[in-house]
């Protein structure tokens, strides 16, 4: 975002400034936090800003894709679900992450700015000044990578620090570099968790860019049992699980194509797919006529949301390698989830399609579906032109456009969008 926008949102959303505001009327200058003594606080702020943006990213991505349907009565929310967001829409560009209509561009840009700023400071300090500096640096860099994953996957284009307009692939290339830098720091710190997270993030960035060989190599470095979550807290609106908040306020419901999914058994029967179990509430959404179906994945406001996992890494390997490797991975992941591992095929297309389907189930409401539809050119459901339940027709958007608030305030971006 341009400076004028960032400065305003930084005060509203950024946890560093939130900490400063509670100390009023002392009016402590933000520069006072540029001290090695505050290194851990600064990195924690980086994590907090990411988690704010990540929750909104997952919820909005669910609406933009085919995971969630809007069942509310707030018209400003409908463009997400209808896939016709306009660049002049203020909701997606400047709203906070905890708004009824969650904003994404500003919260994610704020998180990215915080991570980059903190990482830059950590690079100037020494190990003597900051105990565990390499570990803190690794975390800041890895989160900076995931901030760019969100920008690159959800937006058609974006800008970094008042720079030029970047394509999704250019933003994702930056994400890959941040993960590489974070990996080096994590290895220097001898931190196996952050090392695995860096490999996981880089595998995703490489997959997003179409580098299957590189994604495959990185995904193989993610150990069994690995999972890294974004935390949530029901006592804070900013930290409440954003998908749960949508369900709880009766604003969003699971879409029909993800209701009642099953997995085949070896005997020809089926069992419910517990990875994507949904629950009928017996209520309607806020619109008073659409049934409210919620995901059992997020039944409380403090339910964590996975950022990266062994399961995601395995599915990247399956997509990259295909064949019997993919078949084995599909069955192993099903068995690990307590489901039958009965999938068999030697047809490359059938195997690829099953991997895509497994991703939609295993990674349901984790923020991966919208970009999967885009990068794999999957059919949009409902199709463009179909009547939308709140009026109008479904559009063709697979990503959110660069908002006017960025284009009009950034001197390095063409104002015509050409």
Regions found by a protein language model. Give the residues of each.
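Conserved, well-structured interaction surfaces
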Residues: 40, 46, 77-154, 181-189, ...
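Short coil/turn linking the two alpha-helices of tandem helical-hairpin repeats
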Residues: 150-160, 208-212, 325
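"A position-specific structural signal for the A-helix of alpha-solenoid helical repeats
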Residues: 136, 143, 150, 194, ...
